[in-house]
Amino acid sequence: MAKKLARIAKMVAAESKNEPAADFVNQFTKFIETSQKPYTPSQYYKPSGVGGCLRKMYFERIGQSLQDNASYNLIAMGEAGTMRHEALQEYMVNFSKKDPNFEWLKVDEYLDEHPVEGTNVDTNFVKNDFETKCKNELLQLSFLCDGLVRWQGKVYIMEIKTETMFKFNKHTEPYEEHKMQATCYGMCIGVDDVIFLYENRDNFEKIAYVYHITDDMKEQVLHKLQECEKYVELGISPKVYCNSSYCPYCRKEGRKL
């Protein structure tokens, strides 16, 4: 009994000694979470959401999107993903200077030479030196394109994805929602072939898949957009709920919207 009490006393003393450090972590974490810039949502559809929740698409389209307060770990995951995207894009730009089979193309210049009806480049938006902001007014789509490349004589949309080891090891082709996302890009840029570059964010292993956008995939995207637009015109939120426990539009408290 005496030994057990002595052990407990040591644990309490250790916790007390470390209290300033623990307090620092707590306060610093709160600062990270509360110092994020306010999110101003666009009323355009996002290609990354077209393969997902219809209710989310609807509320974003009418300008009433919900923004959950992001936890510090989700904030860090987003920041890490952005940094890896930019690092890989910079490597690709430099790779294009060394390998004659690879060319990094400028999206705005490509669209000048191969215009797509309804698609415009937002020249006022600058996130970094690699990504291009595009909008298509006919489809009401707005997005940042990771890159456009010519590899071995063929033009591809370059789509970069970072993911956990669990997801990385699970799939043998692009996920369906990623195919839908890339199809949106293809419809807006006029390119029907995609290279998906997946990177394991735990050990940075990479794998790539070539994906060809079919007419059937374009019809699926068009149908999803048209379905959502019908609800927008009626002013009625779709009562079609996704299975995600994280979706604020489909959780119990969000279903009354």
Give the ranges of each region predicted by the language model.
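Short small-residue beta-strand/loop micro-motif enriched in glycine and branched aliphatics
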Residues: 68-70, 166-169, 206
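A structural signal for short, well-ordered beta-strand segments and their strand-loop junctions
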Residues: 49, 156-159, 193-198
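Short beta-strand-loop-alpha-helix junction that forms the active-site gateway
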Residues: 160-173
